[in-house]
Amino acid sequence: MDDDRARELLARERDRIEQALAVRRDDPLEGDDRIEPGDEGSEDLYQDTFDAARIADLDEELAAVERAEARLAAGTYGLSIESGSPIPDARLEAVPAAERTVEEQERFDR
């Protein structure tokens, strides 16, 4: 994959993640002293827990994009961090921040 295409894909991925983070972090009730902790129902607690987990996932996705951008700058984007093998362009199109081939990722995730 050429560098311009990689930059475009990574920029789009960064934008998607940053927009999702902005939505998750934009809580209009945050800091509202009129709401007592006991007023929040269990549904709110569940949603807060879900949002915190989603924010953590998005933060990790953003970190992966930043690592991919660093690899692009270093000239190693598109090569597996595990084996140095080329990551197929189709995988990079689908997952621009991919760090491993599909097979390596499956082993890593086990």
Describe each PLM feature range.
Residues 86-88, 109:
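Short functional micro-motifs and their immediate structural scaffolds
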Residues 77, 98:
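Residues immediately within or flanking Cys/His clusters that coordinate Zn2+
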Residues 80-83, 101:
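Short cysteine-rich clusters marking metal-coordination/redox-active sites
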Residues 89-93:
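Short, non-ligating residues that shape and space the ligands of small metal-coordination modules
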Residues 99, 108:
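The DNA-recognition helices of helix-turn-helix-type DNA-binding domains
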Residues 1-74, 94, 103, 110:
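Interaction interfaces in information-processing and related assembly proteins
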